[in-house]
A protein has these predicted regions:
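Active-site mouth loops of central-metabolism enzymes
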Residues: 7-23, 69-81, 135-151, 228-242
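Glycine-rich, proline-tolerant flexible connector loops at the mouths of alpha/beta enzymes
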Residues: 35-57, 104-113, 164-178, 264-267
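Conserved N-terminal beta1-alpha1 strand-loop-helix module at the mouth
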Residues: 1-41
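Conserved, mostly hydrophobic/aromatic
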Residues: 11, 39, 90, 159, ...
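Glycine-rich anion/phosphate-binding loops
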Residues: 23, 75-89, 112-117
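Active-site pocket-lining/capping segments in soluble small-molecule metabolic enzymes
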Residues: 19, 113, 117-139, 187-241, ...
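Catalytic cores of alpha/beta
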Residues: 78-89, 151-155, 179-183, 203-209, ...
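Glycine-rich, positively charged N-terminal anion/phosphate-binding segment
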Residues: 21-29, 47-65
Length: 289
C-alpha cells in the first residue's frame, strides 16, 4: 500500500424492501463512479440467507459494476458446511475477498456451534482457500465484550495469526484513540494494514441513535455540533460532513492505511467527501480480484 495514497472504500447492506433494492442499485452506480478500492456488503438480519442477500449483492458489485467486492461472513451464524458452500459460490462469482466477523449476537437468531470466534472462521477459510484475502474487524476503543485492553489486542493478534490480511475498524470519532490503538497493535506484532472505519453523521435521527447506543467516545467538538444544530437539518448536515472531512484528512496525514466509509446505503456523503478531498486517495482499486 502506498502510504501517500491510501485506499478509499465503502460499506453497504442488503436491502429488505423493493424500494430499498431500487435505491441500492442507484447508490452503487454513483459509488462506482468514485473508483473505490472495494465495496463491502454486510449481512442482513436473516443471517441464514447470506447467499440470497450478501452474495447476490456482492456479485452485482463485482461482476456488473466491476468494483472489487468483499462479502461479510458472521462466524456465529454459520457452520462448516455453509461456509464451504459459500466459498464455492464466491469462487463462482470471482470474488476472492471476505470480511470474517463473529457477528452481533441477536437473541432471536439461533447461533451455530462450529465457529465460536471470528478467528475460528478465519483459520477455516485460510485453510480451505489460502488464496483468499481475509479482512477482520477491530475496535479502536476495545470490543465491548473484552475484559481489558491487553485481552482485546491478544484476541486481535490471534485473528491475524489465523490468516487475516487486513483490519477494518468499527466507527470512531476520536482520532487520537485510533492512533493509540494502532501503536498498541504494532507493539503486539500486528503488522497488517489497519483501515479506519468512518461514519459521517449528517442528520438528527442518526446522531440521536449514535449518542444512545454507541460505545465510541464522542469528543466535545462532535457533541457541540449536535447541540448547536440539532434542530437545523441543513447546518447539521454541513457541520457533520465537515467534521468527517477533518477527521479523514487527519487520519490520512498521520498514516492511516485507508478510509472505509459506512454509507448507510446513501451515496451523497461519499460523493461530497470525494469532491472535497478525493485527490488524497488512490484513483483506482489496489486490491486484486
Amino acid at each position: 500500500m502506498n502510504v501517500n495514497h491510501p485506499s478509499l472504500s465503502f460499506e453497504v447492506f442488503p436491502p429488505n424492501t423493493a424500494a430499498g433494492t431500487a435505491n441500492i442499485k442507484e447508490t452503487l452506480d454513483r459509488l462506482q463512479a468514485l473508483n473505490p478500492n472495494f465495496i463491502s456488503v454486510t449481512c442482513s438480519n436473516n443471517k441464514s440467507n447470506i447467499e440470497e442477500t450478501t452474495l447476490k449483492l456482492a456479485g452485482y458489485i463485482n461482476n456488473t459494476l466491476k468494483v472489487p467486492a468483499i462479502a461479510h461472513l458472521p462466524a456465529a451464524y454459520l457452520n462448516t458446511q455453509q461456509v464451504t458452500r459459500i466459498l464455492t459460490e464466491l469462487d463462482s462469482l470471482h470474488i476472492h475477498q471476505l470480511l470474517a466477523l463473529r457477528g452481533d449476537i441477536i437473541p432471536e437468531v439461533p447461533r451455530k456451534d462450529d465457529f465460536k470466534y471470528a478467528s475460528d472462521l478465519i483459520r477455516f477459510v485460510h485453510a480451505q482457500k489460502p488464496g483468499f484475502k481475509i479482512s477482520g474487524a477491530c475496535y479502536p476503543e476495545i470490543h465491548p465484550e473484552s475484559p481489558d485492553l491487553v485481552s482485546d489486542i491478544r484476541y486481535l493478534k490471534q485473528k491475524v495469526d489465523a490468516g487475516c490480511n487486513q483490519l477494518i475498524t468499527q466507527l470512531f470519532f476520536d482520532n487520537d484513540r485510533f492512533f493509540t490503538f494502532k501503536e498498541n497493535c504494532a507493539l503486539a506484532g500486528i503488522k497488517v494494514p489497519i483501515i479506519a472505519g468512518i461514519m459521517p453523521i449528517t442528520n438528527r435521527k442518526q446522531a440521536l441513535r449514535l449518542i444512545k447506543t454507541t460505545s465510541a467516545h464522542l469528543p466535545k467538538k462532535f457533541l457541540a455540533i449536535f447541540d448547536k444544530y440539532e434542530h437545523d437539518p441543513a447546518s447539521l448536515r454541513t457541520a457533520g460532513l465537515a467534521y468527517a472531512v477533518d477527521q479523514i484528512v487527519d487520519l490520512i496525514t498521520r498514516g492511516a492505511a485507508g478510509i472505509h466509509l459506512y454509507t448507510m446505503n446513501h451515496a451523497e456523503t461519499a460523493i461530497n467527501i470525494q469532491n472535497t478531498i478525493g485527490s488524497l486517495f488512490n484513483s483506482s482499486a489496489q486490491l486484486n480480484n
